[in-house]
Swiss-Prot record:
Family assignment from sequence similarity: Belongs to the TRAFAC class OBG-HflX-like GTPase superfamily. OBG GTPase family. YchF/OLA1 subfamily.
Modified residues (Phosphothreonine): T132
Cystines in this chain: none
InterPro entries membership: ATPase_YchF/OLA1, Beta-grasp_dom_sf, G_OBG, GTP-bd, P-loop_NTPase, TGS, TGS-like, TGS-like_dom_sf
Protein name in the entry: Obg-like ATPase 1
């Protein structure tokens, strides 16, 4: 039967953990600037954005996600409470060649990557006699190969161990419900072992994605490539390694994002006050790349947010892409999801263009949506729900 006019096409499930408290890990070989990057990211966040900053663990922090739409709502409502969206970032100790076989505490570090949901793959493209390189000389393309292969080898070990168990059950005519998983694992084996490729590039079906999500393979995680330049190269926008790194990424991870930055440049910015920062950025004709990195990392986790906004609070509520209105309401309170009646929605752009909620309503830009509505990034939403005693207005004051 053809779908109804207003039905949405069926969405494939997302690869990765389901949830909103997802983490992105900083991965690379030793001495490429991971901790420097982590420190400037966390140090710059609170002072620059005037948001509360929280260190979860010594090597894990959450950083506010910058957004001009959020800033506009804060300026418009001047609320008592301000809560942005956050990106959880983990600094993972350096991986060395042979990590998948346990070299250099490799298994511990690889398990830390497994606990993350996406990867900032950081490589070093600067010379510094005071910072030795674990492989003796700087070669970011070689470093990319090392990390890429160590992740694949760890997945190979994980796959073969679990495939062997499945094979024994399926071959004996055991649990027939495991046959689709077994078939998916054979497809994964072909890509990972026979073709020696990472898993995130394939067009997997829903059964395959179930298997990928069950075993949380490292090479199925989204990767964003960060290239750490010297401040001199960053300012002059030239580095001999960048074309070679881009060539490697285009060949081995087509479509992946590459963001050059300079830990040294960012560190200098953290030591300046706001006026000095602006003057230095004007002088060098360069800006901090941290905002771009944070936003890219957040989107790489398949996350987005909707806003609730009023004089008491402006808040960005993190959801996964494709979330329906009742589940989005449940982010605020479980009662909102259980008793969901409708969502009253304005797109941010409509609110800004019309100048107020009343004007948006008058212009027909304030819409009532039912439980099949898929929330869009940047929606301003007021939920109506039934809490048993009658209609309640879940509008943020």
């Amino acid at each position: 039967m053809p779908p109804k006019k207003h039905d949405e096409p069926e969405r494939k499930p997302l690869i990765g953990r389901i949830g909103t408290n997802l983490r992105i890990g900083i991965v690379g070989v030793p001495n490429v600037g991971k901790s420097t990057f982590f420190n400037v990211l966390t140090q710059s966040a609170a002072p620059a954005e005037n948001f509360p900053f929280c260190t979860i663990k010594p090597n894990e922090s959450r950083v506010p996600v910058p957004d001009e739409r959020f800033d506009y709502l804060v300026e418009y409502h001047k609320p008592a409470s301000v809560v942005p969206a956050y990106l959880n970032v983990v600094d993972i100790a350096g991986l060395v060649k042979g990590a998948a076989e346990g070299q250099g505490l490799g298994n511990d570090f690889l398990s830390h990557i497994s606990a993350c949901d996406a990867i900032f793959h950081l490589c070093r493209a600067f010379e510094d006699p005071d910072v030795t390189h674990v492989e003796g000389e700087v070669d970011p393309v070689r470093d990319l190969e090392i990390i890429s292969e160590e992740l694949r080898l760890k997945d190979e070990e994980n796959l073969l161990k679990n495939l062997d168990k499945l094979e024994k059950v399926v071959a004996r005519g055991g649990d027939k419900k495991l046959k689709p998983e077994y078939d998916s694992m054979l497809k994964i084996k072909d890509i990972l072992i026979d073709q020696k490729r990472h898993l995130r590039f394939e067009d997997w079906n829903a059964h395959d994605i179930e298997a990928l999500n069950k075993y949380l393979f490292l090479t199925s995680k989204p990767v964003i490539y960060l290239v750490n330049l010297s401040d001199k190269d960053f300012i002059r926008k030239k580095n001999k390694w960048l074309p070679k790194i881009k060539e490697w990424i285009d060949k081995n991870d087509p479509g992946a994002l590459l963001i050059p930055f300079s830990g040294a440049f960012e560190h200098q910015l953290t030591e300046k006050d706001e006026l000095e920062r602006k003057a230095y950025e004007t002088e060098t004709k360069c800006k901090s790349m941290l905002e771009k990195i944070v936003v890219t990392g957040y989107k790489g986790l398949q996350l987005e947010y909707f806003f609730t906004a009023g004089p008491d609070e402006v808040k960005a509520w993190t959801i996964q892409k494709g979330t329906k209105a009742p589940q989005a309401a449940g982010r605020i309170h479980t009662d909102f999801e259980k008793g969901f009646i409708m969502a009253e929605v304005m797109h941010f752009e409509d609110f800004k263009a019309e100048g107020s909620e009343a004007n948006a309503k008058a212009a027909g830009k304030y819409r009532q949506q039912g439980r099949n509505y898929t929330v869009e990034d940047g929606d301003i939403i007021f939920f109506k729900f039934n809490a048993g005693a009658g209609l309640k207005d879940a509008k943020k004051k």
